[in-house]
Amino acid sequence: MFLTHQRVAETTFADVLTALWLAVDPMAPTEWFLDNLVGPIMDRLTAVLGTPMLGYPFMQRAYLAAVCIAVIGPLVGTFLVHREMAMLSDTLAHTAFAGVVVGLFLNSALSLTLSSLVTAFVVAIVTALLVELLVEHAGAYTDTSLAMVLTGGFAIGSILITATDGGISVGIDAYLFGSLATVSTANVGILLLISLVVGGLVTLTYRPLLYVTFDATAAQAARLNVRLYKRLMVVLTALVVVSAMQIMGVILVAAMLVVPVAAAARVARGFRQSVTLAVLADEFAAIAGVTLSYSYGIAAGGSIVVTAIGVYIITLAVQKLAPSLRRLDRLQPGHSEAGLKADGGEKE
């Protein structure tokens, strides 16, 4: 009798959980955000600018995804570049590709229903922690070890693809080169969530991360948990890389974390200003790149990266020309008060 009541209770509890899961749509907040906030803004811009592409739902998702990536990319990338870890983002992107293929391979071989994005997150995070563990024992990041991890991850992915006679090759191109059409509501929801997590954690741990980035020895002496903050940074990098992979592609996703930061470093006067300028540069590149991608039917990732490189070239030119322009300005008549008095005139 007791067993019967226990089974009924267990069944009822399971039914309640199932009903709650079916009743509460995990994507409902994202759909509400797109329909009630992003949609009306895009519709207004469509009316003002006369560009119908802003009214298409898939373009609204693409723009929102690009904007999110352009925020979290430099937010993490600035710390990476100043720690001379820029290659880590590329390494994690290629191992994340192996994670995608692992998920597709298991679904094909074992008839499972795993999300390839979940397996990509798992593989990227595990790889990030393993790389950090290797660094702790080696004492420094080495291009050789990162290159081996990068090529090894990509090699595993290619082996699994060919092991099924190309049966899982469908959709791989979208991960390699990025695609606007494949950015779903679920992708946007994940990006929004990761943006909040990454932004929140970087804000809360900004000073310790800054301390560890520039002087890990002094941070250790100040009794900061240097190992914890270093591992936190590589895990955040893995989250950013995988979440951006769908629109940027595996091959180009690292550029979102590196190129805008390099451009900002040319003109910034401090770390905080460097982060701000990198985000602004990345936002410009993302919005312009998505627009060019739709207008000319070219890859979104490639468009964004080429635009970002263009911004870098401009900042490089500004940095090189600024001293010459200042010298020319000093030679202009009436530049100094002494020059004005010597001429016997006044500045109008």
Protein language model regions, located:
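Membrane-interfacial amphipathic/re-entrant helices at transmembrane-helix boundaries
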Residues: M1-A70
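Transmembrane helix-bundle core of multi-pass membrane transporters
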Residues: L17-A19, R44, V48-L49, L146, ...
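Structural signature of hydrophobic alpha-helical transmembrane segments
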Residues: M59-A70, T113-I125, L192-L196, S243-M256, ...
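Small-residue-rich segments of transmembrane alpha-helices in multi-pass membrane proteins
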Residues: H94-L104, M148-L160, T182, V226-K230, ...
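Helix-loop-helix "hairpin" substructures at the membrane interface of multi-pass membrane proteins
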Residues: V188-P260
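Transmembrane alpha-helical segments in multi-pass inner-membrane proteins
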Residues: V253-G302
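Cytosolic-side transmembrane-helix boundaries in multi-pass membrane proteins
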Residues: I298-E348
